[in-house]
Amino acid sequence: ELLAARNRIVFEEFFSFLLVLRKNKDLAAKTENHFPMYETADTVRFLEQLPFPLTKAQKKVWGELREDMGSPYAMNRLIQGDVGSGKTILAVLALLMCAANGYQGAMMAPTEVLAVQHFETISGYVEKYGIAFRPVLLTGSMTAKEKREAYAKIASGEANPVSYTHLRAHETT
């Protein structure tokens, strides 16, 4: 009987958790998008210049991203895939769409190594394809002076996009 009661409590707690998740998802789906963005010649040109075509799956996700970013509702999207499956190029396209519509974008990474890799990838695209980015990196190993300089570029709008580790999201040095 004790085990049955415990199982019932666990079930009810989990069920309550699922209800809250569903409610939050429904609320998020109704959150107004105050910054709708639309595909521009910049993203089309960038795609045409790439030495490879997007895969069928990437084209599908890129279409969904464009639709979501132009939607009257805020986007909440996670791009999931294996290493090397092309997630970064999709994120870069979304960041380019932000920049082309006059907004700043940011690419958060769970580790400093990945944040640096994203920064280097984006910087490489700037050099190779002449895209309108002024990337900046923000990580924990940067000196206080480097962080202040990065924050100043972000605040002034000079930096776009920002590649950072998740720990930097709430830090104000």
Where are these regions (language model features)?
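Pre-Walker A segment
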Residues: 1-85, 89-106
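Generic beta-strand/beta-sheet core signal
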Residues: 80-82, 108-110, 138, 164
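Short beta-alpha junctions and helix-cap segments that line functional grooves
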Residues: 94, 109-110, 149-151, 164
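Conserved SF1/SF2 helicase motif Ia
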Residues: 97-114, 118, 130-131
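Conserved helix-turn-beta segment of the N-terminal RecA-like "Helicase ATP-binding" lobe
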Residues: 116-141
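Conserved helicase motor
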Residues: 136-147, 167
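Conserved motor-coupling elements within RecA-like helicase/translocase cores
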Residues: 143-161
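Conserved small/polar residues in nucleotide/adenosyl-binding loops
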Residues: 165-172
